Amino acid sequence: MTSHKKFLNNYFDEQSSCLRELSNNTTLLELVVEKLLDARSSDSLVITIGNGGSASTASHFTADLLKTAIMKDQKRFQSLCLTDNIPVMTAWSNDISFEEIFKEQLKNFIKKNDVLVAFSGSGTSKNIVKALELAKNSGAYLIGFTGMSGGDFNEICDICIKVPSTNMLTIESFHIMLCHVITSCIRQTGTPEFSYE
């Protein structure tokens, strides 16, 4: 039987290294939490997008905002994930192009002071970048979660959270963890409606 010990040790070493780097600078994460709380207070829409594994992260984050982040005696988040409506996505992809699937959906919803949260391991996905550009021109606030060099997210996003890794699996793992960190931080601002302890 082949031993996987070396690989597993190296894998966990990389995760530990990424976690140390992220935990040493939480300033951007604090800004994300504050921006989301502002959006909740003003009834602004928080829209999430992503492709592949990042699509599932986007959907998961919206689910957490809509339920896990419910606080007693406070407004609820208004949130929408654009990867959740498969018929609409395939309609735009089939009739126009895959690059337009998020941009065209945003035209139905996005307005000034809304928040667009984009997930992309590379920060270069064309359909994501096009959506960010439209949202920026609409006066929305842009939050990007990425990795590697950060790609286009570095320039276009108001806040760019970059996982310090070139491994896509590691990047995606940390994106969902960061979403849970943000949700947990929001839950500390009052009395959560639901207990998960």
Spans of model-derived segments:
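Generic N-terminal amphipathic, Lys/Arg-enriched alpha-helix
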Residues: M1-N24
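A charged, well-structured terminal subsegment
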Residues: N108-F109, L116, L169-E197
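Short beta->alpha connector loops at strand-helix junctions that form conserved
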Residues: T83, S120, T146, I161-L169
